[in-house]
Amino acid sequence: MLKMTVIDAKGLILGRLASSVAKQLLSGDEKVYIINAEQAIISGSRAATLREYRETRERGATEFGPYFPKRPDRILKRTIRGMLPYKRARGRDAMSRLKVYVGVPYELKGAETVTIPDADMRLLSSSRYVELGEVSQKMGSKF
């Protein structure tokens, strides 16, 4: 039986959260559930961050890809996927042990949550950041 870890993404820096979760998934001994994905933050200026995500989303053709998600849970999952060897069996197995949610789902209400101290937003030297939910809404998501 795999150990279950529930991580609350509220106030955690997206990249640092993703790298920590990727390491946990590659160790192979636990399932990871991330809740409140829309409250994860991206450091940097609001305008530059929104522009980068919009340009990434508009890249390529709608029929042929690359396909980039709008919803915050999917953006977070895609970010973690970029840190895994997802085209190999080890990476596919790691991705299958990951679940990301907007808000808190019914089955995880009351579950003990863990935070990642290295990814806390209080470690930022600047107060410039944007929440993942806001980026998602600016790209047209209706989560």
Swiss-Prot record:
Disulphide bridges: none
List the record's Gene Ontology CC terms alphabetically: cytosolic large ribosomal subunit; ribosome
Going by the entry's taxonomy, the superkingdom of the source organism is recorded as Archaea
GO process annotations (BP):
negative regulation of translation; translation
Transcription regulation among keywords: no
List the Gene3D superfamilies.
Ribosomal protein L13
Q: What's a Pfam family this protein contains?
A: Ribosomal_L13
Q: Does the keyword Ribosomal protein apply?
A: yes
Q: Which UniProt keywords apply?
A: Ribonucleoprotein, Ribosomal protein
Recorded GO MF terms: mRNA binding; structural constituent of ribosome
Q: What functional role does this protein have? A: This protein is one of the early assembly proteins of the 50S ribosomal subunit, although it is not seen to bind rRNA by itself. It is important during the early stages of 50S assembly.
Protein family? Belongs to the universal ribosomal protein uL13 family.
What does the subunit section of this Swiss-Prot or TrEMBL entry state? Part of the 50S ribosomal subunit.
| Database matches in PANTHER family | LARGE RIBOSOMAL SUBUNIT PROTEIN UL13, RIBOSOMAL PROTEIN L13
What this protein is called in its record is Large ribosomal subunit protein uL13
What species does this protein belong to? Methanosarcina acetivorans (strain ATCC 35395 / DSM 2834 / JCM 12185 / C2A)
Q: What is the name of the gene encoding this protein?
A: rpl13
